[in-house]
Regions:
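PLP-dependent class I/II
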Residues: 1-139
Length: 139
């Protein structure tokens, strides 16, 4: 099978002709452009929803700016917070916060909060759990 793929690669340098034809038609008919416009509106709404929820639940604890692009918000904590502890507390409520989105040193405590794959209900649940974890840690 591996040898056949190698031979096919040598013979057919052009790729998948049917796929190329289909994509060409989609571009010519404006399908890609319509999908892009629709996607941008969805992600802008998710960004706005996330920013509003962060302000509502964590407004006094974090600073952030709505990004003009991308699928995440960089949130800096106003006061130092032990992000490892926050992550552990959130895990008790089934909210997994990977260490790769946490940033902490002597001068800054921040998180990269992604919103691209969450709907408003999921966002609100996650941010509420995060806010409760911060509140519990402050006690």
């Amino acid at each position: 099978m591996v040898e056949m793929r190698k031979l096919l690669g040598i013979i057919d340098r052009q790729g998948d002709i049917v796929m190329e034809q289909a994509l060409g038609e989609m571009i010519a008919e404006g399908e890609i452009h319509r999908y892009l416009k629709k996607s941008l509106k969805i992600y802008e709404q998710r960004r706005d929803d996330c920013a509003a929820l962060l302000q509502q639940y964590l407004g006094g604890h974090i600073r952030f700016q709505k990004p003009s692009g991308g699928l995440a918000i960089w949130a800096e904590w106003a006061a130092p917070v032990n992000l490892s502890q926050v992550s552990k507390i959130c895990a008790r409520s089934d909210l997994f916060i990977p260490k790769t989105i946490l940033y902490q040193n002597r001068n800054i405590t921040a998180m990269r909060l992604g919103f691209g794959d969450l709907n408003e209900t999921e966002m609100e649940k996650a941010i509420a759990i995060l806010a409760k974890a911060v509140s519990d840690l402050a006690r």
